[in-house]
Swiss-Prot record:
Protein's recorded name: Tubulin beta-5 chain
SMART domains: Tubulin, Tubulin_C
Pfam families: Tubulin (PF00091), Tubulin_C (PF03953)
Function: Tubulin is the major constituent of microtubules, a cylinder consisting of laterally associated linear protofilaments composed of alpha- and beta-tubulin heterodimers. Microtubules grow by the addition of GTP-tubulin dimers to the microtubule end, where a stabilizing cap forms. Below the cap, tubulin dimers are in GDP-bound state, owing to GTPase activity of alpha-tubulin.
Cofactor: Mg(2+)
Organism of origin: Gallus gallus (Chicken)
PROSITE patterns: TUBULIN, TUBULIN_B_AUTOREG
Length: 446
């Protein structure tokens, strides 16, 4: 019932994805060989959301692993959970995309995409009632961004009524891995705006800050960063996998979180995050979780929610707790910080409560915010994009793969439109709307 097919593309996507499967397997009591070693019937009750049970009682992830070079795949296969995945579901090319979006989207990736879709189709046929897809990828590289967005649009064609959910690692403001990141990211956002239902914006820099400031890790590794991401990913789908007092699924989240179809870029957060040494000094209570969850330092995207306003928020609480207390806290935070919530969506916090906490915690919570402050992230990418595009720097790598400059111009203006849409709704009030919105509709229709 309600299965989710997971796809990971590119190096970043595969590393986050693999970490995610470690976390999920741990929650469901699945060992690295796919056997069940858990201790509670609840772990197996809805295990088929993410796992397929083979004839030999082995649980196999509904995961498709995609990359244009064999390197990352090999390290996944030789990693601790490498034997968990179905060998046929590793699909890789030999050439690599070389951080080039055009290679991932038009040339190398396009050659591989049909064999990926075959595997995706096979996974979907094993499903009883497919809920949707989740993709992990980064927007800075070539494969995750170029081929990832190609996969999204192909899957969208074939399964138009299923939810498409992406966990996208955005380029960071200060840390840049590749020079052409702004190009790749802008071209990807151009696709994500049209083709996904929910996109969780994750940012390495924000994750570094959390590891450094909050978790007090002096030298955070990618493993630590990916662990944070996978905690959030596990939180988002927790009510599909475990019974709860108030359930949410991907579609409910989308319906409650997306007021306008293009504005589906969310900031995730997770609580409790405490340094290893100071854990025993903190009481885990609902107020404490709520406090930390709405804290700007806790956001996994490098945007400050205090610079914008929340259109909508979803929170998933995990662990034994009283619903009444959760509701009171949510009401309190909306009343106390009412200026940070748009007033034209009255009750804009969606709550889900699940009874089973993550491993090793008494209670935890996941935060998903649709805030207009996310425009900072797009503005940043857009400025870097314009600076390079004005001089046509590095363009020959993309045009050489058959792309047209026009496509860059379109992507740029689409991203700028997105920024101004966020800005427009940030400034909108409950009663000024009548004339203002009529003008906007005309503009959009042109």
């Amino acid at each position: 019932m309600r299965e989710i097919v997971h796809i990971q593309a590119g190096q970043c996507g595969n590393q986050i994805g693999t970490k995610f499967w470690e976390v999920i397997s741990d929650e469901h009591g699945i060992d690295p060989a796919g056997g069940y070693v858990g201790d509670s019937a609840l772990q197996l009750e809805r295990i088929n959301v993410y796992y397929n049970e083979s004839s030999s009682q082995k649980y196999v992830p509904r995961a498709v692993l995609v990359d244009l070079e064999p390197g990352t795949m090999d390290s996944v296969r030789s990693g601790p959970f490498g034997q968990l995945f179905r060998p046929d579901n590793f699909i890789f090319g030999q050439t690599g995309a070389g951080n080039n979006w055009a290679k991932g989207h038009y040339t190398e990736g396009a050659e591989l995409v049909d064999s990926v879709l075959d595997v995706v189709r096979k996974e979907c046929e094993h499903c009883d009632c497919l809920q949707g897809f989740q993709l992990t990828h980064s927007l800075g590289g070539g494969t995750g961004s170029g081929m990832g967005t190609l996969l999204i649009s192909k899957i969208r064609e074939e399964y138009p009524d299923r939810i498409m959910n992406t966990f996208s690692v955005m380029p960071s403001p200060k840390v840049s891995d590749t020079v052409v990141e702004p190009y790749n990211a802008t071209l990807s956002v151009h696709q994500l705006v049209e083709n996904t239902d929910e996109t969780y914006c994750i940012d390495n820099e924000a994750l570094y800050d959390i590891c450094f400031r909050t978790l007090k890790l002096t030298t955070p590794t990618y493993g630590d960063l990916n662990h944070l991401v996978s905690a959030t990913m596990s939180g988002v789908t927790t009510s599909l996998r475990f019974p709860g007092q108030l359930n949410a699924d991907l579609r409910k989240l989308a319906v409650n979180m997306v007021p306008f179809p293009r504005l589906h870029f969310f900031m995730p957060g997770f609580a409790p995050l405490t340094a290893r040494g100071s854990q025993q000094y903190r009481a885990l209570t609902v107020p404490e979780l709520t406090q930390q969850m709405f804290d700007a330092k806790n956001m996994m995207a490098a945007c400050d929610p205090r610079h914008g306003r929340y259109l909508t928020v979803a929170t998933v609480f995990r662990g034994p707790m009283s619903m009444k207390e959760v509701d009171e806290q949510m009401l309190a935070i909306q009343n106390k910080n009412s200026s940070y919530f748009v007033e034209w969506i009255p009750n804009n916090v969606k709550v889900a409560v699940c009874d089973i906490p993550p491993r090793g915690l008494k209670m935890a919570s996941t935060f998903i915010g649709n805030s207009t402050a996310i425009q900072e992230l797009f503005k940043r990418i857009s400025e870097q994009f314009s600076a390079m595009f004005r001089r046509k720097a590095f363009l020959h790598w993309f045009t050489g793969e058959g792309m047209d400059e026009m496509e860059f111009t379109e992507a740029e203006s689409n991203m700028n439109d997105l920024v101004s849409e966020y800005q427009q709704y940030q400034e909108a009030t409950a009663n000024d709307g009548e004339e203002a919105f009529e003008d906007d509709e005309e503009e959009i229709n042109e």
